Curated annotation (Swiss-Prot):
NCBIfam families: lolA. Participates in the translocation of lipoproteins from the inner membrane to the outer membrane. Only forms a complex with a lipoprotein if the residue after the N-terminal Cys is not an aspartate (The Asp acts as a targeting signal to indicate that the lipoprotein should stay in the inner membrane). It comes from the Bacteria. GO terms for biological process: lipoprotein localization to outer membrane; lipoprotein transport. Pfam families: LolA. It is found in: Periplasm. The keyword Membrane does not apply. Keywords: Chaperone, Periplasm, Protein transport, Signal, Transport. Gene3D superfamilies: Lipoprotein localisation LolA/LolB/LppX. This is Outer-membrane lipoprotein carrier protein. The gene is lolA. Belongs to the LolA family.
Length: 203
């Protein structure tokens, strides 16, 4: 009886692992169907009690695996651009731009996961699938991300994603008007405007 219980437990663990692997494979294959796209988005941030912290909106351009432009237009403008090697963050309000190597950027943020869509990243998560919804929980609890949810159709269109941090703050993004196809290469370059202070951390 004891051997049977142990065997059942082992098989159960194997089945769960296979389900997670299948979900990760399906998620990656769906995202692989669209190599580049543009979409507008709305943002809603709530605290651990569900109280509204911030509402925002902006535009997003992606060309996988490493080119992207995340342009927040409201409530405050900010720009996050990757040219494939350098990651630029620009805040027009304080007139400051920061440059870091993309390879040094954390890969455990929802946007980086979506933009990169690399198997090595997805392997860091336990993934459960319910139709078009994928719920990701980090295997390591050392980071700030507690849970990540993404809704992506079979055609690769991302409808929404959200992230819950360790303090239960939730950031939800609703994507709309996703246009799949070629994106102007200029969207993935950034030149600091004249007079802007540059914090270059690529050293």
């Amino acid at each position: 009886m004891k051997k049977l219980a142990i065997t059942c437990a082992l098989l159960s663990g194997m089945v769960v692992s296979q389900v997670w692997a299948d979900a990760a494979s399906d998620l990656k294959s769906r995202l692989d169907k669209v190599s580049s796209f543009h979409a507008s988005f709305t943002q809603k941030v709530t605290d651990g009690s569900g109280n509204a912290v911030q509402d925002g909106q902006g535009d997003l351009w992606v060309k996988r695996p490493n080119l992207f432009n995340w342009h927040m237009t409201q409530p405050d403008e900010s720009v996050l651009v990757s040219d494939g090697k350098t990651l630029w963050f620009y805040n027009p309000f304080v007139e400051q731009a920061t440059a870091t190597w993309l390879k040094d950027a954390t890969s455990n943020t929802p946007f980086m996961l979506i933009a990169r869509n690399q198997s090595s990243d997805w392997q860091q998560y336990n993934i459960k699938q319910n139709g078009d919804d994928f719920v990701l929980t980090p295997k390591s609890g050392s980071g700030n991300l507690k849970q990540f949810t993404i809704n992506v159709g079979r055609d690769g269109t991302i409808h929404q994603f959200s992230a819950v941090e360790q303090d239960d703050q939730r950031s939800s993004y609703q994507l709309k008007s996703q246009q799949n196809g070629a994106v102007d290469a200029a969207k993935f370059t950034f030149t600091p405007p004249k007079g802007v202070t540059v914090d270059d951390q690529r050293k």
